[in-house]
Amino acid sequence: MMRLFAVLLCVVVLVPAASAQPAPQDRAPDDEVRQHLRTRIEAQRRGLDALAVEGETAQASAAVQAFYEDRQFAPVWVGPSGPTPAVDRLLTVLERADRDGLPPAAYYVDDLQALLNEIRAASGTDAGRLADLELLSTDAFLLYGSHLLTGRVSPTELEPSWNVEGRRGDLVSVLREAARTGAVAEALQSLRPPQSEYAHLKTALQRYRRLAARGGWPAVPDGESLKLGAHGPRVDSLRRRLAKTDDLTAERSAAPDSFGVALETAVVTFQERHGLEADGVVGPATRAALNVSADARAEQVAVNLERWRWLPQSLGRRHVLVNIAAFRLRVVEEGEDVLRMRAIIGRPYRQTPVFSGAISYLVLNPYWHVPHSIATKDKLPEIKKDPDYLARQQFEVLRGWGADAQPIDPSTIDWSRLSASNFPYRLRQRPGPLNALGQVKFMFPNRHSVYLHDTPTRGLFARAERSFSSGCVRVEKPIELAEYLLANQTQWAADRIQTALNTSAAERSVFLPEPVPVHLQYWTAWADADGTVHFRADVYQRDDAVHRALSDRVQ
């Protein structure tokens, strides 16, 4: 027996007086369906019962009610002859929801198909079953549309610190237009993220799912590192593995178990796509990435498609985009990258938060006002071990955080008596070559107290994995970024910036005439326009939670 459908009304229908209704044979099926819809939805509005999803409240019950009341309960998916072609078009779209990384089962595909088959087998005359189909189809459209528009998973449930305003839209209006034109697929297509990155990832998802369906790729067995000149069956496994993902495109060697130059080049290509040290040597890290299954990579792509659905309609005509998981910063203008650089992000226990803001000013030769947590956890132990630590590292000690706080002599403080619970001081590092913020910081005021900044520790940018900060983002090319942001201010030409940095140790704020949006996001997979797919390690261990939530049948 068929399961209860998503938007069936569990109501006790009050039968009107016979004189108030035309005889059944005098009424078209869609007229009877309209009456069923009116009775059920008005009962729901009066609180007599609720639209139900297999006994649960319908996912889009409020929108369903608003839609039908606005059109005087006229059906969309049912006509005088029964189900319309629009139902089939909707079903086709829903069956392809997995192309967006969404589970078709969440949109009642099996129930819709079974109900449609039942109605057509019975010549489509049962008004009650037609009303069931009508309500189920509408709820499926609205639910799928809402997931394309804002995501299936609530980012704030997974990340309480999430602070990005997502897209908004009037789904009832979209459905109304689809009902008017019959363009169901086009209406739902309009709800997808407009960014090209989303479309590229969709293509990547299909590619990796095809690879998985064909058996994936061979594993590279454990053993010593493989490099140029190596021989043996493990080299042949490596060759076949890299060919599956088109990292190895050169003609197959006459000696497939020999590690030649073409294979070394393919290894470097793979390493670059995965954010690994691109040395052409297959060590433990590279082998681990090679042996991640095609299914797992497809899931990773689906997770990152969802992350795009959480974002605003527009990131800004020009904007700064930090991919935390990739340790990269891009400056984008009119959809094109105009500046790229490496970045250093927060350690796993001091994670860089995901949020959006707007860079409104720069600070040249900044002081570093050490956060209380860092002062007590990191700096206080150093001070206790070495009385000269503060002077050598150019720190000042102030009592309190007010603007009028004055420096005090650190030698007058009994540091041994202090701890995190009774530390009343503020540490401030003077501008200069030792300053942790380097020569410039980029400010976008936010509740996380996070910003972009230079760093004197330049060597860390050479590392493949760059999670070394306390939450803020260190940028590889701070002067180039400053020059870009100040390019339209004639008084701040490149030479003037260098002069201000090199001839004065005084802190100076420079405000932008127009704030520039900045987005700190977390993507572990993305695809280029040429089809190159990139993956990164899940440094903050966030992918699994999104994947589990996406995989649930009902949210």
Predicted regions and their residues:
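Well-ordered beta-sheet/strand-loop patches within structured domains
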Residues: A20-E69, L135, D139-L143, W162, ...
